[in-house]
């Protein structure tokens, strides 16, 4: 009696996770349907991050996205803040989607694109006529030679491989096989730049009166690794803020003349900014986004000039207006209110009963409560949005790589084989794209080959 020892041995337990990853997880991860689904989900939430204002205060969302009635029947301020739609690009789930999408592309590159490239680089000569039958395009000629075909293919920029006079292999457009890999590298680079920017970038807002110097302090949104991006050893001075108005009184453009100062107060950069023309310094960008009125400079009788702060008043959506109050008696028992709606210098003066006393422009005086009130100037303030995104250079690099890969992918990888058997010439070829154009090219090559053969025969006769 003999014992059968051929039964398979059980695999060690530590190899099971690897087998699961290769057989179960990896095919799902590299599935094109998963990549498309992830791309659509990322695009959907990116659109939501564009439509829904990012980084605003809770009061803003409560005002613009009330519970009754809810936008689209479900979108309220509670949903926005619970899900994280007020800072989409820095939420853990959005970054996880980017990581998963990048991992899927990387796995696809190593399991499909790179093997396809290696396969394209491996080739063999066809030494039997029957091998040409499996090609998408083949022909059998009773005239012509491999050497004549080689010259024609060289003129068409094919790379020729020939070890014998009767066998030939030629190809061109191998770069088209590399293109998809470059596209994947570009997309992954863009994803890495987006993740790095979300982790290390920040957004701040400042409302700065004309003539003041400030450091970036009002951070409204920042990544967990953004502390190193905050400006520490330099500040910014708003030299002047002004608005150009149209002949009808509307705002044409608003400007800020700004200087960057070092720790010693020396100017190291200077620029006049306006909408779509920001100031950039050390990776931090200052955008002109808003404006306001910070104060009004006045004089009572022959007193020194002093500046009163002006506050934005609640008008229930009827436009913006700023106001302040100035006493006209030392015991503060009487005073008047000053109101302004723009920087054109018009100031409205109201008494304690809310009655309009006078309207003056900058530089004019008027009598109120027995004193001479002179309005010298209305001081504007510039509204700045300040951003730092260290991932932008990486994203731009990724887009450059992506565009290069797209261009490379347009090249067809075309292959041609030829075999001379006696007086018969076998020619065949295949391509990975643009099949019709390749067929036309092969027909032109065969026609050229026949014409050369006919010329040689005529010369011999």
UniProtKB/Swiss-Prot annotation:
Its main location: membrane. The keyword Transmembrane helix applies. GO terms for biological process: cytochrome complex assembly. The chain crosses the membrane at residues 32-52, 91-111, 178-198. It is found in: Cellular thylakoid membrane. GO terms for cellular component: plasma membrane-derived thylakoid membrane. Keywords: Cytochrome c-type biogenesis, Membrane, Thylakoid, Transmembrane, Transmembrane helix. The keyword tRNA processing does not apply. It is a multi-pass membrane protein. InterPro entries: Cyt_c_bgen_Ccs1/CcsB/ResB (IPR023494), ResB-like_domain (IPR007816). Pfam families: ResB. HAMAP family: CytC_Ccs1. Required during biogenesis of c-type cytochromes (cytochrome c6 and cytochrome f) at the step of heme attachment. May interact with CcsA. Belongs to the Ccs1/CcsB family. This is Cytochrome c biogenesis protein CcsB. It comes from Nostoc sp. (strain PCC 7120 / SAG 25.82 / UTEX 2576).
């Amino acid at each position: 009696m003999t014992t059968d020892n051929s039964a398979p041995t059980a695999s060690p337990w530590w190899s099971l996770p690897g087998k699961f990853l290769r057989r179960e997880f990896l095919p799902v991860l590299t599935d094109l349907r998963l990549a498309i689904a992830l791309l659509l989900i990322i695009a959907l939430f990116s659109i939501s991050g564009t439509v829904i204002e990012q980084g605003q205060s809770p009061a803003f969302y409560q005002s613009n996205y009330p519970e009754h009635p809810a936008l689209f029947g479900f979108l309220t301020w509670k949903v926005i803040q619970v899900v994280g739609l007020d800072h989409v690009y820095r939420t853990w789930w959005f970054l996880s989607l980017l990581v998963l999408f990048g991992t899927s592309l990387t796995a696809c590159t190593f399991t499909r694109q790179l093997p396809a490239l290696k396969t394209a680089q491996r080739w063999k000569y066809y030494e039997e006529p029957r091998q040409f039958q499996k090609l998408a395009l083949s022909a059998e000629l009773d005239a012509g030679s491999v050497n004549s075909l080689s010259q024609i293919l060289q003129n068409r920029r094919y790379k020729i491989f020939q070890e014998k006079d009767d066998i030939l292999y030629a190809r061109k457009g191998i770069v088209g096989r590399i293109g998809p890999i470059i596209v994947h590298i570009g997309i992954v680079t863009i994803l890495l730049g987006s993740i790095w920017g979300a982790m290390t970038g920040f957004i701040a807002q400042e409302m700065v009166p004309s003539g003041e110097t400030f450091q970036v302090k009002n951070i409204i949104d920042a990544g967990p690794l953004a502390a190193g991006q905050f400006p520490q050893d330099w500040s910014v001075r708003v030299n002047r803020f002004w608005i150009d108005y149209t002949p009808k009184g509307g705002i044409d453009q608003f400007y800020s003349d700004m200087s960057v100062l070092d720790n010693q107060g020396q100017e190291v950069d200077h620029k006049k900014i306006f909408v779509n023309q920001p100031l950039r310094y050390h990776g931090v960008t200052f955008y002109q986004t808003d404006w306001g009125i910070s104060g009004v400079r006045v004089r009572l009788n022959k007193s020194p000039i002093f500046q009163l702060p002006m506050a934005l008043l609640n008008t229930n959506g009827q436009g913006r207006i700023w106001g302040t109050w100035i006493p006209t008696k030392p015991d503060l028992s009487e005073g008047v209110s000053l109101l302004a709606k723009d920087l054109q210098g018009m100031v409205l003066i109201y008494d304690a009963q809310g009655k309009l006393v006078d309207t003056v422009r900058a530089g004019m005086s008027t009598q109120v409560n027995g004193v001479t009130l002179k309005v010298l100037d209305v001081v504007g303030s510039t509204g700045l949005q300040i951003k730092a995104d260290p991932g932008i250079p990486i994203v731009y690099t990724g887009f450059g790589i992506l565009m290069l890969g797209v261009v490379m992918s347009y090249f067809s990888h075309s292959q041609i084989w030829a075999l001379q058997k006696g007086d018969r010439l076998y020619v065949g070829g295949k391509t990975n794209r643009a099949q019709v154009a390749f067929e036309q090219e092969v027909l032109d090559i065969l026609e050229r080959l026949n014409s050369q053969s006919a010329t040689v025969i005529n010369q011999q006769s």
